[in-house]
Amino acid sequence: MDKKTSRLRRALRGRKKIQELGVNRLVVHRTPRHTYAQVISPDSQVLASASTAEKAVTEQLKYTGNVDAAKVVGKTVAERAIEKGVTVVAFDRSGFKYHGRVAALADAAREAGLKF
């Protein structure tokens, strides 16, 4: 089993648990160059999103693939979710370790007002 398949299997286990709870989830995806975050409802509707691929976010950054960029994405997605009335979410790390950019995004979202 390769590295990507292992990550996807971990992601499915976590998502199944979150779907049983029936709450909105904050989904994180990362690539070497970008970090993406979405708030998704239990019926699979995207309520808010932010990524380092967006011009509004990229203008604030020197480089898009680091911890500082993840903090900006976390803050932005939290602000957009709160505007839509979403304050409580479950954190879906998509099989990535809770470390580095993933942890930085989560901490920034918490500081901006999301509860999880």
From Swiss-Prot:
InterPro entries: Ribosomal_uL18_bac-type, Ribosomal_uL18_bac/euk. Signal peptide: none annotated. GO terms for molecular function: 5S rRNA binding; structural constituent of ribosome. Keywords: Ribonucleoprotein, Ribosomal protein, RNA-binding, rRNA-binding. GO terms for cellular component: cytosolic large ribosomal subunit. It comes from the Bacteria. GO terms for biological process: translation. This is one of the proteins that bind and probably mediate the attachment of the 5S RNA into the large ribosomal subunit, where it forms part of the central protuberance. Belongs to the universal ribosomal protein uL18 family. NCBIfam families: L18_bact. Part of the 50S ribosomal subunit; part of the 5S rRNA/L5/L18/L25 subcomplex. Contacts the 5S and 23S rRNAs. This is Large ribosomal subunit protein uL18.
